[in-house]
Design a protein with these regions (language model features):
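Hydrophobic/aromatic-rich core segments of domains that either
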Residues: 48, 92-157
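Secondary-structure boundary elements
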Residues: 3-7, 11-81
Length: 216
């Protein structure tokens, strides 16, 4: 069964209503139409990917905030907003870009780093097109074909499932901090179902379970 990144990411973001789901999938389609360059069919896949990246930054240059949106629906709304709000954090920007890439016929992956820019865990897009492997740093306006992570010894490639797992992990942490332990646990467990080797989700789940025991 095909793993639909956009649908799964929206579900992980908290959308359950089919009408809402269709609405946001339609918004993704609108963004593709908005940012697809004229004559795109004549461009190489690499050029299409670059032009999409540049168009997103041109339209919303105030894109990145470390604690910004990570839910796909919120990132989409921020991208479409005329209020100049920040679009998202590294996870949100990467999911948005990868979803749009799929809609123009390009399969992007994600790259997970344990410590990027000296600030901790980080995700970005990685493209494998023809003989090229290109990092796309979604938090930087000049981030297409970014070279700064090439020598990182802890580069870990993520597929769509692992990327969606990070949404569940982020939601779990958000709910944990709000004291909604039961819902937090569900999200950590969903993260681990999609990415059983995700140590961060496993650790946070263990911390949560210990906390729940002490408060029984």
């Amino acid at each position: 069964m095909v793993f639909d990144l956009a649908k799964k990411a929206l579900a992980a973001s908290g959308l359950r209503n089919e009408d809402q789901m269709r609405d946001y999938l339609g918004k993704l389609d609108f963004l593709v139409l908005q940012f697809s360059p004229k004559g795109a069919r004549g461009f190489s896949l690499l050029t299409r990917a670059q032009k999409l990246f540049e168009a997103l930054w041109k339209e919303r240059p105030n894109r990145y905030q470390p604690q910004g949106h990570f839910r796909l629906n919120e990132v989409i709304d921020a991208q479409l907003s005329n209020k100049g709000q920040v679009v998202g954090n590294c996870l949100g920007l990467t999911i948005l870009y990868n979803c749009l890439l799929k809609r123009i016929g390009i399969e992007g992956e994600a790259l997970h780093l344990e410590n990027a820019f000296g600030t901790g865990a980080h995700v970005l897009t990685v493209l494998r097109i023809d003989d090229f492997t290109i990092d796309v740093e979604n938090i930087l306006p000049e981030g297409f074909d970014y070279k700064g992570h090439k020598k990182d010894p802890f580069r870990l490639t993520w597929g769509d499932k692992e990327l969606v797992a990070d949404i569940y992990q982020s939601r779990g942490t958000e709910l944990f901090e709000k004291g909604q332990f039961g819902e937090a646990l569900k999200n950590y467990e969903m993260a681990l179902k999609l990415n059983p080797r995700y140590e961060k989700a496993e650790l946070n789940r263990a911390i949560l379970l210990d906390r729940m025991k002490t408060e029984e």
